Curated annotation (Swiss-Prot):
Primary localization: nucleus
InterPro entries: Ataxin_AXH_dom, Ataxin_AXH_dom_sf, HBP1, HMG_box_dom, HMG_box_dom_sf
DNA-binding region(s) in UniProt: 434-502
Keyword Transcription regulation: yes
Subunit structure: Binds the second PAH repeat of SIN3A. Binds TCF4. Binds RB1.
Subcellular location(s) of the protein: Nucleus
PTM annotation: Ubiquitinated by the CTLH E3 ubiquitin-protein ligase complex, leading to subsequent proteasomal degradation.
Domain AXH: 203-345
Function: Transcriptional repressor that binds to the promoter region of target genes. Plays a role in the regulation of the cell cycle and of the Wnt pathway. Binds preferentially to the sequence 5'-TTCATTCATTCA-3'. Binding to the histone H1.0 promoter is enhanced by interaction with RB1. Disrupts the interaction between DNA and TCF4.
Composition bias type Basic and acidic residues, residue spans: 170-182
Name used for this protein in its record: HMG box-containing protein 1
UniProt region (Disordered), positions on chain: 150-182
């Protein structure tokens, strides 16, 4: 039975209170005993009642309402009558400062009330800070599969009509392409708009998905063996590879091609369709399959066996895809998605590579910023909490020095700062804050300096720089473009991370003239 309380003060503010009606052959007295109130008010219904009439002086007129027999019995009270659906403990009343009048009509349930209690400022849960959302360290330690191929999402219903790609025992492919999220994320480096702490999902919405083997969309393939030796897009090849058509006999030799990985034999930089690309030659490991030559973008990431994510231009890759990478070398074996060595590989390999280098403030690239983030992560893990970030910052202070200590206690550091036209204010948390990134020629010289030093063993570093400068002047604009793009990407990233870098430098240079 349902009772409705009508009052003239607040006719619209009616709250419903569920009563569990005893369906057994018992009186109303037994069923009303299930109602528990924390306050003993005169207006509360008493136990001495019958099914037809209740004589209470302060209780408004009660009218019987016809209800659906399939629904549960409800007892409706005016909002000025204190009541609760379930008994709450005393700490709930103290910690929740949200009044009951703020709840909307008919939308309050037990879970909502618990959520309001848990998220209140006085809640013990909200007083515990597990991590800082603005810290990049949280992003690195989010998922165990940080440097593994992401699992593709379930294929949507709209893609069922398209020909599906073959799924081998090591392959996990999907026609769905993961677009890179907005770079204006709170991470500062990793370009993601949302994060998931679920180890099964990881960062699958941010990592690029491969179309075939380890190659991304936009890659062109050319097989050295087979009837079709022409250049073809990886999308067209994957679509034809997925069609189980007996007429396409030329595709038969490519079934399971490079299942154990593709070994890099050679690489060169060329121009294709007016764009600078990488021309790579791979060996699948079997003589009958033949070699494979591909043309891919400069920032194309590869997952290398026993190394992790790698790229020919790590700075471009981390800006474009948000993937910290090592450098690719001849002999590296690029693994496909789902390969056992790619799944079980230790995720910290890339950061271990960063740890082997001693970066200086001159290395103002995105890779250096990532290495700093990795050191913060290791420091936070060793300290066992958010205090590790302070430990990492203190480590930076020891290496780079604070504004006061660098000028008072170390004249050599101050002289070096003046020589390099630095601003004189070195941040403890960002060692490369006052350093401009390398330009196109510096990137070119950094890549070929070791090679030219080996070619001319009798020449010193200055002579090698002169030779590199002559080589740079003789290069065509198409050949320089790849370095220009990388330098531009580094400059934009540096300006985004440290917008006052150039401004402070001009201010400091002006003060030095006086």
């Amino acid at each position: 039975m349902v009772w409705e309380v009508k009052t003239n003060q607040m006719p619209n503010a009616v709250q419903k209170l569920l009563l569990v009606m005893d369906k057994r052959a018992s009186g109303m007295n037994d069923s009303l005993e299930l109602l528990q109130c924390n306050e003993n008010l005169p207006s509360s219904p008493g136990y001495n009642s019958c099914d037809e009439h209740m004589e209470l002086d302060d209780l408004p007129e009660l009218q019987a309402v016809q209800s659906d027999p399939t629904q549960s019995g409800m007892y409706q009270l005016s909002s000025d009558v204190s009541h609760q659906e379930y008994p709450r403990s005393s700490w709930n009343q103290n910690t929740s400062d949200i009044p009951e009048t703020t709840y909307r009509e008919n939308e309050v349930d037990w879970l909502t009330e618990l959520a309001n209690i848990a998220t209140s400022p006085q809640s013990p849960l909200m007083q515990c800070s597990f991590y800082n959302r603005s810290s990049p360290v949280h992003i690195i330690a989010t998922s165990k599969s940080l440097h593994s191929y992401a699992r593709p999402p379930p294929v949507s219903s709209s893609s069922k009509s398209e020909p599906a790609f073959p799924h081998h025992h090591w392959k996990e492919e999907t026609p769905v392409r993961h677009e890179r999220a907005n770079s204006e994320s709170e991470s500062g480096i990793f370009c993601m708009s949302s994060l998931s702490d679920d180890d099964d999902l990881g960062w699958c919405n941010s990592w690029p998905s491969t179309v075939w083997h380890c190659f991304l969309k936009g890659t062109r393939l050319c097989f050295h063996k087979g009837s079709n030796k022409e250049w073809q897009d990886v999308e067209d090849f994957a679509r034809a590879e997925g069609c189980d058509n007996e007429e396409d006999l030329q595709m038969g030799i490519h079934k399971g091609y490079g299942s154990d990985g593709l070994k890099l034999l050679s690489h060169e930089e060329s121009v294709s369709f007016g764009e600078s690309v990488l021309k790579l030659t791979f060996d699948p490991g079997t003589v009958e399959d033949g070699l494979l030559t591909v043309e891919c973008k400069l920032d194309h990431p590869f997952y290398v066996k026993n190394k992790g994510w790698s790229s020919f231009y790590p700075s471009l890759t981390v800006v474009q895809h948000g993937i910290p990478c090592c450098e690719v070398h001849i002999g590296d074996v690029c693994l496909p998605p789902g390969h056992p060595d790619a799944i079980n590989f230790d995720d910290s390999g890339v950061f271990d590579t960063f740890k082997s280098y001693d970066f200086t403030p001159m290395d103002s690239s995105a890779v250096y910023v990532l290495s700093s983030m990795a050191r913060q992560r290791r420091a936070s893990l060793s300290c066992g909490g958010p205090g590790g970030q302070d430990f990492a910052r203190s480590g930076f202070s020891k290496n780079c020095g604070s504004p006061g200590s660098s000028q008072l206690s170390s004249n050599s550091l101050y002289a070096k700062a003046v020589k390099n036209h630095s601003s004189g204010t070195v941040s403890a948390t960002s060692p490369n804050k006052c350093k401009r990134p390398m330009n196109a020629f510096m990137l070119f010289a950094k890549k070929y300096r070791v090679e030219y030093t080996q070619m001319y063993p009798g020449k010193d570093n200055r002579a090698i720089s002169v030779i590199l400068g002559d080589r740079w002047k003789k290069m065509k604009n198409e050949e320089r473009r790849m370095y220009t793009l990388e330098a531009k990407a580094l400059a934009e990233e540096q300006k985004r991370l440290n917008p006052d870098c150039w401004k402070r430098k001009r201010t400091n240079s002006g003060s030095q003239q006086h």
